[in-house]
Amino acid sequence: VPDYRLDKLNEMYNPKKLVPTTFEFTDIAGLVKGASKGEGLGNKFLSHIREVDAIVEVVRCFEDGEITHVEGKIDPIRDIEIINTELILADLEIVENRISKIEKKAETTKDKAAVLELTALRKSKEALESGKALRSVEYTEDELLCISGFNFITLKKIIYAANVNDEDAIAGSNEFTKLVQEYADKEGSKVIVMCAKLESELSDYEDEERKAFMEDLGLNASGLDQLIKATYDLLGLKTFFTSGEDECRAWTFKDGMKAPECAGIIHTDFQKGFIKAEIMSYEDLATLGSEKAVQEAGKLRLEGKEYIMKDGDICYFRFNVTK
């Protein structure tokens, strides 16, 4: 995950090791009509996609006579709806199968858990049958909890990556991406405009060369960097840092996590034996110039077990594990 703050910490500490935080994009083979019934790589594709945290749908938004579209012409909305329909049908099959198994129990025994699950599933079925993704459904917290184990695909958040030619990537849009944006706006999703061909070329350059090339093109950030940031935000992820002469490292945590949980990301012993966290903000360190200056300014804080971590916190965890 690109982060200018880690670059600044590298300048300040000159550590032996610099470790950015990461997350993984998995390239899953494309979907065809009938995938929900097992056609193409259908069942295999769907089993893979159920395990992910979020979905990035790459949508063709460029004309090129040398690259034939499987459907014959460029129509990004049609392509999106082919994919989304297959995902909806796949979820609907699971919902219907589960309803048939618990319906009788819920209605005869009035078991609270079964009744709650049946209510959530019927709500899901109604949405899916009307062509709506489950992420558009308003569930209660209890309903969401009881259906979380099904890994419904259409419950996952989505980003549309509009794949354009290099000229349109520099311009930021074209007639096709505008259609995708309108579609995404209706469901509250985000669109990233990028050129896969250009991104491939950029990946061949070293950092300084890449930066110079992008400046020549008038690009502030690569499409990949924009996609990474958008995905990070979509999943509610934040970054804290550990820094020193040996290593400066960025760590990913979920928004709302407390200090002991974040300590546990580094090592389970840190969480088990958590005592306190010494914390300074990146902004204070960057402004004041050194840890010593931060401390002298009274900006170095000792936080306890209930402290909710903030993006950009630089941490030293105090812990003690008795064997």
Predicted feature locations:
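Switch II of P-loop NTPase G domains
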Residues: Y4-E57, C61-E81, T140-F150, S173-F176
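Hydrophobic faces of stable alpha-helices that mediate helix-helix packing
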Residues: F25, I49, L92, E96-I99, ...
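Flexible beta-alpha connector loops of hexameric P-loop NTPases
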Residues: L31-K37, G72-I74, E81-L87, A106-A113, ...
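C-terminal-of-GTPase-core extension/linker across diverse P-loop GTPases
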Residues: K101-K310, C315, N320-V321
